[in-house]
């Protein structure tokens, strides 16, 4: 069983504290495997291998654009999180899967999750040997006209409630997307769609991946993403489509279920998972648990999937 919480728009520090709480509870086997989905306000995170020189912008410029900076314990270099980007934080005990997973196998599964999401939007994506993340290799410029490789596109979900309503008890804002300025980016054949950076402590994972959906790609001009000079792209830039984060979240949750051979259970509230005394350090409101409409609660049950 993997329990899913949608935190909606949530500042990085709050989401990080929640991760840390869940990691400790997972180590004690007091919570199941948990998958957090979140959209962050603009923020740069620096992993253990980060070089400050990969932040190109001055601190003054970052402040003027409302970009926070956090140094964290995940692997990797510097990356950007912001509106229009789907971030996933799996809090998994790798020993709970059959067969149990090693760190490399786990990262490869995250890459496979991302590649299958991209395939849903008819984007051909691949790994690059010696690197972590998911890339697209195109022989023609990306389409910006709303048509994707000759295939019709129908949104999978436009729901604003149910399992995709931000779970109460952490952050209450709905997921939104920002306009993109990706048209300014020069076409190249090799572009990065998603970044991965994880941390594993006593077999329990934290941090995860960030998939650019409708992200304003100009923010990546502030850094050398992951210490690489290769360009960054998004689902919107590649296809001309603007799927909601809720829609992509639905695809992601089902794909996690398939690849990790687990039931996926959407939760209404953080308090469905963590006793109230354990949420004090996350600055979480404790008095307004979310209650989804009955039809959306039915969707949540339908999303329980056993591969």
Spans of model-derived segments:
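N-terminal lobe of the biotin/lipoate ligase/transferase fold
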Residues: 1-165, 170-190, 218, 243, ...
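Histidine/acidic-rich helix-loop-helix segments that form or flank divalent-metal centers
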Residues: 193-196
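Conserved phosphate/anionic-ligand binding catalytic regions in large, soluble enzymes, centered on
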Residues: 79, 202-214
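A hydrophobic, small-residue-rich beta->alpha segment in the mid-to-C-terminal subdomain
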Residues: 214-260
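Catalytic cores of Mg2+-dependent Asp-rich isoprenoid enzymes
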Residues: 269
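Short, active-site-adjacent segments that bind or coordinate small-molecule cofactors and metal centers
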Residues: 198-204, 275-278
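Short, well-ordered beta-strand elements within core beta-sheets of diverse protein domains
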Residues: 91, 198, 235-237
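Residues immediately flanking
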Residues: 39-41, 200, 213-215
């Amino acid at each position: 069983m993997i329990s899913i919480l949608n935190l909606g728009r949530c500042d990085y520090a709050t989401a990080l504290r929640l991760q840390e709480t869940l990691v400790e509870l997972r180590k004690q086997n007091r919570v199941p495997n948990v998958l957090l989905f979140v959209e962050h306000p603009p923020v740069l995170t620096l992993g253990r291998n980060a070089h400050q020189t990969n932040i190109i912008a001055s601190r003054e410029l970052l402040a003027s654009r409302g970009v926070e900076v956090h140094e964290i314990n995940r692997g990797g270099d510097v990356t950007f999180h912001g509106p229009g980007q789907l971030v996933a934080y799996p809090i998994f005990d790798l020993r709970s899967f059959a067969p149990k997973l090693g760190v490399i196998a786990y990262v490869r599964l995250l890459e496979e999750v991302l590649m299958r999401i991209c395939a849903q939007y008819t984007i051909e994506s691949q790994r690059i040997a010696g690197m972590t993340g998911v890339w697209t290799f195109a022989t023609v410029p990306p389409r910006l006209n709303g048509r994707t490789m000759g295939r019709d596109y129908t949104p999978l979900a436009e729901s604003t409630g149910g399992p995709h309503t931000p779970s109460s008890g952490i952050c209450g804002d709905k997921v939104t997307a920002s306009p993109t300025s990706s048209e300014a980016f020069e076409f190249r054949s090799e572009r990065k769609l998603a970044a991965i950076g994880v941390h594993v402590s006593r077999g329990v994972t934290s941090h995860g991946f960030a998939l650019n959906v409708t992200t304003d790609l100009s923010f990546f001009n502030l850094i050398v993403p992951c210490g690489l000079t290769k360009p960054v792209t998004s689902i919107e830039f590649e296809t001309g489509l603007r799927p909601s984060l809720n829609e992509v979240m639905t695809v992601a949750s089902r794909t996690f279920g398939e690849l990790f051979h687990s039931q996926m259970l959407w939760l209404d509230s953080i308090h469905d998972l963590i006793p109230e005394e354990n949420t004090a350090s996350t600055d979480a409101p404790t008095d307004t648990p979310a209650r989804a409409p009955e039809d959306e609660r039915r969707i949540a049950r339908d999303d329980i999937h056993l591969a």
